[in-house]
Amino acid sequence: MLFVDIAKAFDKIWHDGLLSKMMRLGFSDQLIKIILSYLNSREFRVRVENSLSTPRPILSGVPQGSILGPKLFNLYINGIPETAEVHLAMYADDTAIFTQNIYNHNIIEWLQNYVIRLKTWLKDWKIKVNASKSAFSLRDSGASETSRMSIFLISLSTGLLNINT
């Protein structure tokens, strides 16, 4: 099983990509314009002691804590690759990618192939993975109870499932 955490998920949503996805999914032009207005009308300022910067536009992300933010995030990650051998369980920006087989080498091969596909998709959609919160776990049903679970770090930046024992 792979546990993948998307880095700054709500802050990094690529606006043009989200709007493009909404168009491909058949959202009405009127709704897309409303969402565009919602996303583009945000700005920020920086205060250092008594000095306040001029307003700057926020060019990516969706407002956290809003009702619409999680729904827009779900739309944005719609289309994450799926295969017959590999399954996904997602909650917000956390994803569990899992498979099962009696042979560990099949599991590792399927997950490795999936990681390569996922890496391309993540790059295309400008999504980064938080490597420090992502891991690989292999449960061997034939092993003794004390040695069934192994946790490894994964590297989606290289597209490799790094299994270091």
Q: What kind of region is each of these model predictions?
A:
Residues 50, 113, 129-164:
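Short, conserved micro-motifs composed of acidic
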Residues 4-6, 94, 101, 141:
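Residues immediately flanking
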Residues 16-21, 106, 145-146, 152-153:
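Short secondary-structure boundary/capping segments
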Residues 54, 70-99:
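Active-site palm subdomain of RNA-directed nucleic acid polymerases
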Residues 39, 77, 115:
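Short amphipathic alpha-helical/adjacent loop interface patches that line ligand
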